[in-house]
């Protein structure tokens, strides 16, 4: 009778695998309903191995959120200079490789009091970016408001989450083109209203 072959991973690779498995488990069950045993099962390892990398469930959840934010920053830098929708392209790229992690950051973390700062800080960065883009596009001053920037960000986040859930990855370029066309159209429509 042959047993399972044990796969030894180096520490960074194991940590990354745990983070991805934890993101899936937390996104599926929520923070409160997910145990470290659930994370271990999702990662195909023992709870002891999870604890070798993370002291607590809180530390693990925070690490998942920070990892997603770090990868979004790296992806944004990689897409820099490729048009105005750098943030959307970065969100989609990371979302395609880790939909659960992006879901935690954009949807779940804001509702978890001990983790809301991760979502709030990220959202604030994107709102500031949206406001800067409106200024660069010479949007009228009456349009450039906190409300407008927040509305654009809400539109992008919701559109992205729905696309990740229901959209065909082969049509990602079409999705990006629609978002690229929609954002200026919204700002232009707002500018036309007195």
What are these regions (language model features)?
Residues 113-138, 143-154, 174-177, 181-188:
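Amphipathic alpha-helical packing segments from all-alpha helical-bundle domains
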Residues 94-117, 131, 158-165:
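Amphipathic alpha-helical segments used for helix-helix packing
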Residues 1-29, 33-44, 58-62:
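Basic, helix-initiating cap at the start of DNA-binding domains
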Residues 44-54:
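Short hydrophobic/aromatic patch on the recognition helix
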Residues 58-68, 118-122, 126:
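Alpha-helical DNA-contacting segments of helix-turn-helix folds
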Residues 1-13, 134, 138, 143, ...:
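N-terminal intrinsically disordered/low-complexity leader segments
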